[in-house]
Amino acid sequence: MENIMNNPVIGVVMCRNRLKGHATQTLQEKYLNAIIHAGGLPIALPHALAEPSLLEQLLPKLDGIYLPGSPSNVQPHLYGENGDEPDADPERDLLSMALINAALERRIPIFAICRGLQELVVATGGSLHRKLCEQPELLEHREDPELPVEQQYAPSHEVQVEEGGLLSALLPECSNFWVNSLHGQGAKVVSPRLRVEARSPDGLVEAVSVINHPFALGVQWHPEWNSSEYALSRILFEGFITACQHHIAEKQRL
């Protein structure tokens, strides 16, 4: 049996919650299981690790960074807008932005999902639509909370893959496919540092990658949902873990 301790170490950002009155940081199992099934070892990263001296000690131990989805939203002041965000998680923002900036500098692989994509957009100088439902030209991208969870994560709309990018390299035989959709915010302006990898039929950005980086991919949908059952999802996670293995080899050569 393979020793999981030999697998790439993937740092996973958590979300702030309250449990019976106590401040708590949590991770949904589906995000962790997707990494394990793809051959990685997920390690939860407490928000306190955003402190620069701790982050500096942490980064050499990580082979990849995983930014999962969340019920919370990125604070608007981080992308130049005024107003409060009722569903904010400032400590997650702080850690995620620090991790993204460090990973881009050190060429550490990143896989970002839903809120994670939005963090990647903001960290590289872009901005977000705060309420997609107020954009009349866009589809309804939110899930129906009254439906069972399995139906909330069912395919909702197609995405069209842009040619010549990371996503098309990972999925060379698949230029369009159906995805689930469970988000109220989305990319508005994408920095020149990013390549748009896929769009939904209404033109909304559904995937991005960082230009001149070995693997920094963000997707707006949720491939972690039952990832082992869907070939496209497995390919994304396995591509991420393969990039992490290449990063390990690069570190060993230095």
From Swiss-Prot:
Pathway named in the protein's UniProt entry: Amine and polyamine degradation; putrescine degradation; 4-aminobutanoate from putrescine: step 4/4
One Pfam family this sequence matches: Peptidase_C26
Transmembrane segments: none
Domain of life according to the entry: Bacteria
Catalysed conversion reaction: 4-(gamma-L-glutamylamino)butanoate + H2O = 4-aminobutanoate + L-glutamate
Residues annotated as catalytic: C114 (nucleophile), H222, E224
Protein's UniProt keywords contain Hydrolase: yes
Keyword Hydrolase part of the UniProt annotation: yes
GO BP annotations, alphabetical order: putrescine catabolic process
GO molecular function: gamma-glutamyl-gamma-aminobutyrate hydrolase activity
Keyword terms: Glutamine amidotransferase, Hydrolase
GO CC annotation, single: cytosol
Residue ranges annotated for the Glutamine amidotransferase type-1 domain, each copy included: 16-250
Entry EC number(s): 3.5.1.94
PROSITE patterns: GATASE_TYPE_1
UniProt similarity note: Belongs to the peptidase C26 family.
Function per UniProt: Involved in the breakdown of putrescine via hydrolysis of the gamma-glutamyl linkage of gamma-glutamyl-gamma-aminobutyrate.
Name recorded for this polypeptide: Gamma-glutamyl-gamma-aminobutyrate hydrolase
Source organism of this protein record: Escherichia coli O157:H7
Lineage per the UniProt record: Bacteria, Pseudomonadati, Pseudomonadota, Gammaproteobacteria, Enterobacterales
